[in-house]
Structure formats: C-alpha cells, structure tokens
C-alpha cells in the first residue's frame, strides 16, 4: 500500500530498483533504457518508473540528496514494496590525482561522517559494505562492455560544503575513490532489513582541480554507469 512518500501499490515496483539521486535522471533512464515504462511514483516530485530491460522487469526511482532522504525511500521500498536489491547510480567527487572526471567507481565499501549507522548499530561502528554478488556482477558487466572501473571505498558525507577541507587529505591517504552523500546509508538500510545494495558512481567533479561536469551532463549522460547497472542485473539472474 502507499506510504507517506511513495504513492504506489504492492507489485508496482520490480524486485530490483536503480536509484539515482536526481528524479529527472530516473525519468531519463526510464525513457532511454526501459521498454513500456510507466510512472509508479510522483510524491514530492520523486519520480519512479517500472519497465523492462531486455525482457527483465526493473524499476528506477530517485532518492534525493543525503542519507536521511535516501534512507526513507530505501526502507519503504524494501519493507512496503518487496524490493530485494537496490543499486544506487549517482555522481561523486574525486580527491586523488589518479581518479579522473567520468571514471566509474564501484563502491565496495562506504565510509561516512554520518552517525546514522551508529544509531542503528547501538553506537558501534558498522562496516557499510556492498553485497558481494552485486559488486561481482557489476565488475563482470563492465568488463564485458570494455568499460574501465575503479573498485574500492567511497565516502558518504553529511555536508556538501565541507567546513574541514583537510579531511580530503585523509581521504586521499586512505585511498577513497569518491565522495558522495548516500551510499553508507543505503548499505545500512539494506543490512538492517535484509536486502542487497550497491552504489555505482560516476566522477562528476574533481575536488582538488576544480574540474567538473555540468548539471545537464549529470542529468542526461553518464550512460556507462547506467549500462553497467542494467547489465549486472541480468548477470545476477543467470
């Protein structure tokens, strides 16, 4: 049944949902990659669609910005609509020189400065990691399409405008591949409610050099990341 944030019914969503932050990117994915896509959510403008990709039923819905927002949608999709797998497809910022604009990053683990997972985990540190099979299938899908990817840790921040730029030095030292705002929360929700999750991100800007993509590019391109996610779902069915 419908929730305060999703006006859909059981069965409207597929068991796998791709989740970009931007609802307009969700619409772009539905219109570009899915067949027979129909809108299944529009509450607060957070657009959601269900269609098929190469005959496989798949949904896509935005999750907004930040861990609180994405946690609401992820939790409701899992507990109220029977979703089993969530793949975040979003943008991230790079802090290391060897990570370049438009590189695709597969988030094997997600560090964070958020306290959300500590609240879930009785004030202990929770290892927010992706599901191994989802990681493996994403890597295999990228190889099959000859798309280079980076696999490793990303960092989910609570503040987009950081008051502590020295933290970027620490991230670089520890080999963080990308900085974003949601993956650690989605991994925590998936673990709490028995689902599987993965974040695949495209580097949209470089925090060190200032190089960046435009808002339009972020909304309508980054197709490599989307194709990896879609093809990985098919591999997971085999």
UniProtKB/Swiss-Prot annotation:
Keywords: Glycosyltransferase, Transferase. Phosphate binds at residues 21, 25, 44, 88-91. Gene3D superfamilies: Nucleoside phosphorylase domain (3.40.50.1580). SUPFAM superfamilies: Purine and uridine phosphorylases. One of its GO terms (cellular component) is cytosol. The keyword Transferase applies. This is Purine nucleoside phosphorylase DeoD-type. A purine D-ribonucleoside binds at residues 5, 180-182, 204-205. The record marks 218 as: Important for catalytic activity. GO terms for molecular function: purine-nucleoside phosphorylase activity. The active site is at residue 205. Catalyzes the reversible phosphorolytic breakdown of the N-glycosidic bond in the beta-(deoxy)ribonucleoside molecules, with the formation of the corresponding free purine bases and pentose-1-phosphate. Belongs to the PNP/UDP phosphorylase family. Homohexamer; trimer of homodimers. It comes from the Bacteria. Its EC number is 2.4.2.1. It catalyses: a purine D-ribonucleoside + phosphate = a purine nucleobase + alpha-D-ribose 1-phosphate; a purine 2'-deoxy-D-ribonucleoside + phosphate = a purine nucleobase + 2-deoxy-alpha-D-ribose 1-phosphate. InterPro entries: DeoD-type (IPR004402), Nucleoside_phosphorylase_CS (IPR018016), Nucleoside_phosphorylase_d (IPR000845), Nucleoside_phosphorylase_sf (IPR035994). GO terms for biological process: purine nucleoside catabolic process.
């Amino acid at each position: 049944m419908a929730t305060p944030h999703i006006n859909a019914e059981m069965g409207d969503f597929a068991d796998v949902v791709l989740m970009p932050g931007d609802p307009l990117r969700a619409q772009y994915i539905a219109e570009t990659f899915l067949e027979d896509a129909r809108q299944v959510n529009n509450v607060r403008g957070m657009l959601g669609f269900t269609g098929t990709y190469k005959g496989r039923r798949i949904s896509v819905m935005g999750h907004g910005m930040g861990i609180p927002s994405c946690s609401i949608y992820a939790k409701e999709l899992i507990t109220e609509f029977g979703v089993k797998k969530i793949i975040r497809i979003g943008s991230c910022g790079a802090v290391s020189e060897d990570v370049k604009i438009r590189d695709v990053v597969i988030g094997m683990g997600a560090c964070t400065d958020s306290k959300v997972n500590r609240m879930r985990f009785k004030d202990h540190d929770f290892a927010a990691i992706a599901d191994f099979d989802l990681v493996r299938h994403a890597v295999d899908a990228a190889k099959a399409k000859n798309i280079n990817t980076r696999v490793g840790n990303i960092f989910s921040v609570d503040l987009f405008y950081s008051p502590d730029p020295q933290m970027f030095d620490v991230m670089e030292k520890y080999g963080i591949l990308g900085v974003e705002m949601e993956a650690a929360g989605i991994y925590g929700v998936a673990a709490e409610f028995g689902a599987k999750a993965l974040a695949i991100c495209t580097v949209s800007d470089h925090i060190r050099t200032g190089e960046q993509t435009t808002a339009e590019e972020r909304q309508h391109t980054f197709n490599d990341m989307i194709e990896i996610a879609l093809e990985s779902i098919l591999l997971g069915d085999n």
